[in-house]
Structure formats: structure tokens, C-alpha cells
Amino acid sequence: MLLVLLFSLFSVGFGMRVMRRELLKDQPTVLLLGPLEVLTSSSSEDDTPDFPSLRDKRGVDPMSIPRLIKEPPLKKRSGDFKRGDVVYPSAAKQTVPLVRVREPPLKRGQMFLEELLQFNDDAHRQFMDPLRRIRYGPNRLIYTW
């Protein structure tokens, strides 16, 4: 039973249609494979009830798929800019940067090099001296002399 089901799914996947007919009343039902076709809506008088008129099934045109899918707009219409918004510039307007640059805030106790150079006392001069000797202690702290 499982093999018949897998074979029928395989056949339908390759464009074949499974037809069901009864040969005789006392014989079991036989499945026949044929081309993939669908029934027409109009039925003529010369058609037999076992085999109505058939026609080929047509699929969706692959060139019409972009018309079926609605594409999102490429740029935001709001006038306010938030952090992380992506703005696609148009050719008619002046371009805006995609990533807004801002400086990170200073950490507590952080000093710039220019501020260190303003001090004139001996402790800061020794700190700024590039030729000082450094010795590491047992607790890995830096000692200078």
C-alpha cells in the first residue's frame, strides 16, 4: 500500500494523472497512468461518461509572478530620522549617509592625552616619560621608579 502511494505521488509529481476505472464488476479497481489533464467545463453529447473531454492544464506564467508579489517601498516616508533607520537616497534629493556617525560617551575617569599634557607637576611628567623603567610586582601591579 505504501509503495502504491509513493509511486502515485511520484507519478503526479512528474505530470501524470492517475485514472481510476473498473474493468468488470467482480474485478478489483485498476489504476492507470495518463498525461496530466483536467476536465473542461463544457460537456458535449458525444463524450462517454467514462471519458469526458479533456484538455491540458496550464500553470501560472512565470513572468507574471513579480506582478503578483507586492514589493515594499525602498525608502521611508517619515521626516524624522531615528538611530538605526536605513534611508535609501533618491537621485532627485541630496544623499544622506546610511550610517550616522556619533562619538561614544567617555567612561568615568577617562582622560584625553591633551589633558594629561597640560599638567606640569613631577608625578605627571614621570607618568608621561617614555623612557621610564617598569618593574612588575608579585601581584602584577606596575611599579615605576
From Swiss-Prot:
Primary location recorded for the protein, binned into one broad class: secreted
Gene Ontology cellular-component annotations: extracellular region
Cleaved signal peptide residues: 1-15
Source superkingdom: Eukaryota
Localization per record: Secreted
Keywords for this protein: Secreted, Signal
Region of interest (Disordered), residue spans: 41-65
Protein name in UniProt: Neuropeptide-like protein 68
Organism lineage string: Eukaryota, Metazoa, Ecdysozoa, Nematoda, Chromadorea
